[in-house]
């Protein structure tokens, strides 16, 4: 059964496959008690900075600067930035991640099987991913008439949400809890990514074409100001996943 990361757990739960406590509370007969159905929701949370350009006339986006290489970047390029390029103290921050991921599973109100799956995945993230050249963030460029938008999207969040039905009616929307920024580490990674974006715009060739930073603006400088802005500006990149995890059932997955 595959209906996407939102509707797959919804249909399974409606069919009696999912966390028994949830199903029984809604009067649904339990066919298979599978606690991981609807858990482990992950998403690429993102936000974008906006800059006005010096040539703000009615110029098509593909010719905003007149330089093909520059225009190519700000219109269509996607950059994946390695962990050590985002954090000056990358080793120290990796240590914080390792310490944190050991504690997260025990803090979550989930079934023991789901907790074991979290432990396995978090261990992989902390010990492999953040020590490789795999990027924790994606940086995207986009040009509109008179402005440039540079966005950062978190690629490997530590925060986990869930999806749960609210009734037996298949036409009722499930409750989606993305749980963005439950883990402060996610917020800090995005914060440093946006600092990098600001730095990029202050270097050639972009600095020669940017007139001002419109959003969030130069008033945002401290770590606290960056984090407040991100909390208010961030949203989904529409990449939810993992609500029917391809893990063994004893680790909260749906694979027998």
Language-model segment annotations:
Residues 1-51, 56, 148-205, 228-256:
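C-terminal structured subdomain/cap of oxidoreductase catalytic cores
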Residues 9-12, 16-144, 205, 221-225, ...:
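Mid-to-C-terminal "cap/lid" subdomains and adjacent gly/pro-rich loops that border
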Residues 145, 219-221, 250-252:
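Short, internal active-site loops enriched in acidic
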Residues 185, 217-224:
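Short coil/turn linker and secondary-structure boundary residues
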Residues 207-219:
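Short, glycine/acidic-rich hinge or "gate" loops at secondary-structure transitions
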Residues 214, 225-228:
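Residues in intrinsically disordered, low-complexity segments of regulatory proteins
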């Amino acid at each position: 059964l595959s209906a996407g990361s939102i509707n797959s757990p919804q249909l399974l739960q409606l069919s009696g496959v999912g966390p028994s406590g949830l199903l029984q509370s809604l009067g649904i007969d339990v066919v298979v008690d599978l606690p991981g159905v609807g858990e482990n929701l992950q998403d690429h949370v993102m936000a974008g900075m906006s800059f006005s350009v010096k040539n703000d006339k009615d110029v098509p986006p593909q010719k905003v600067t007149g330089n093909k290489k520059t225009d190519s970047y700000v219109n269509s390029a996607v950059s994946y930035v390695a962990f050590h390029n985002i954090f000056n103290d990358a080793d120290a921050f990796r240590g914080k991640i390792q310490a944190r991921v050991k504690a997260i599973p025990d803090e979550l109100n989930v079934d023991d099987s789901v907790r074991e799956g979290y432990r396995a995945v978090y261990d992989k993230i902390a010990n492999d991913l953040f020590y490789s050249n795999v990027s924790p963030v994606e940086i995207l460029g986009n040009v509109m008439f008179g402005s440039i938008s540079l966005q950062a999207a978190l690629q490997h969040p530590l925060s986990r949400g869930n999806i749960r039905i609210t009734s037996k009616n298949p036409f009722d929307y499930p409750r989606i809890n993305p749980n963005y920024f439950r883990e402060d580490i996610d917020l800090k990674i995005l914060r440093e990514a946006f600092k990098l974006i600001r730095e990029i715009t202050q270097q050639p060739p972009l600095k020669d074409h940017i007139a001002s930073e419109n959003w969030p603006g130069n008033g945002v400088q401290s770590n606290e100001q960056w984090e407040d802005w991100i909390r208010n500006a961030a949203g989904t990149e529409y990449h939810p996943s993992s609500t029917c995890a391809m893990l063994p059932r004893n680790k909260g997955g749906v694979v027998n």
